[in-house]
Amino acid sequence: MVFWRDIPAQVKARQGRERAARGLDPRFQEAVDAAAMRAGLTDTDHYLAEWRTSAWEERPGSPEQAADQRAAEIEAEYSAERLRAIVENGGKEL
């Protein structure tokens, strides 16, 4: 997973040399942008410094299947209210 602070932005999966990546619904990028503005992190260096990746996790299936499944889970786990609360806290989950 790729995050800006605590906001997920992309799912990545791999198996050997095979890789897959899935962007999330545009509301996640909109939340990243709004949280960055709220936190005052509008210059490139500070904005880029907040991106991080999580540890890889094992999942069954091909990288494409795993990425699709995890992306669907993330989109279901992050309601509009949850994202709004994270944005209001400058991109950090309470």
Task: Provide a role label for each language-model segment.
Residues A49-D68:
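Mid-chain, well-packed structural core segment of small domains
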Residues Q65-L94:
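C-terminal charged interaction modules
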Residues G16-T53:
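Acidic, aromatic-enriched beta-alpha/helix-loop junctions
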Residues V11, D33, S79:
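Residue-level marker of positions within ordered structural domains that often coincide
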Residues M1-R19:
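Short, charged/polar N-terminal "headpieces" of proteins
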